[in-house]
Design a protein with these regions (language model features):
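Hydrophobic membrane-insertion alpha-helices, especially the h-region
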Residues: 1-17
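Mature extracytoplasmic domains of secretory-pathway proteins
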Residues: 55, 59, 63-123
Length: 162
């Protein structure tokens, strides 16, 4: 058991170091808000994906992101056939379940584009690991285009004791 921990520990430390390095590059006064009408090579898409820990399909449009030191919120529109491609690269480890939009709390500091509570047909999926908690919300109100909400939270963790 101790040998397995020692073998895995360097990989965990490298991953956490990369996450803290990314988070440390954010402005001191708050988060960074980004809008992309469509994904373009060389754009800030890679920055968004790295912080949200998702892969946004090329067919996504109207991409909004708010990246803070402790969480990342992303919202984008996606054609329904591309949803299965997107969900494979998330931390969702449970099937989607219906969610009453009235049960979604909106905070006063939420950006204008973060409104899952306004959906008519909302589903959620959650997952994560020892340092990330991710929630995916799928708004299927418009059958021609899904609105996807991604909330990725940094989990509190403790340094392994010796």
């Amino acid at each position: 058991m101790a040998v397995a921990v020692l073998l895995v520990l360097p990989f965990i430390i490298l991953k956490l170091n990369a996450i803290f390095h990314r988070r440390g590059s954010l402005p001191a006064g708050g988060g960074r808000e980004i809008y992309l009408a469509f994904p373009a090579p060389g754009s800030e898409l890679e920055f968004i994906q790295a912080h949200a820990e998702v892969r946004i399909p090329d067919s996504a449009i109207e991409i909004h992101a708010l990246i803070n030191k402790s969480d990342t919120r992303v919202r984008f529109n996606l054609p329904p056939p591309d949803f299965s491609l997107f969900i494979k690269d998330t931390y969702c480890d449970q099937p989607f379940s219906a969610l009453n939009p009235r049960d979604v709390r909106c905070e006063e500091h939420d950006p204008d584009w973060w409104r899952p509570g306004a959906a008519i047909d909302l589903e959620k999926c959650t997952g994560g690991n020892s340092y990330i908690h991710q929630q995916i919300l799928k708004d299927g109100s418009d059958r021609g285009s899904l609105v996807i909400y991604v909330l990725t939270l940094m989990e509190a963790f403790e340094t392994p004791s010796e």
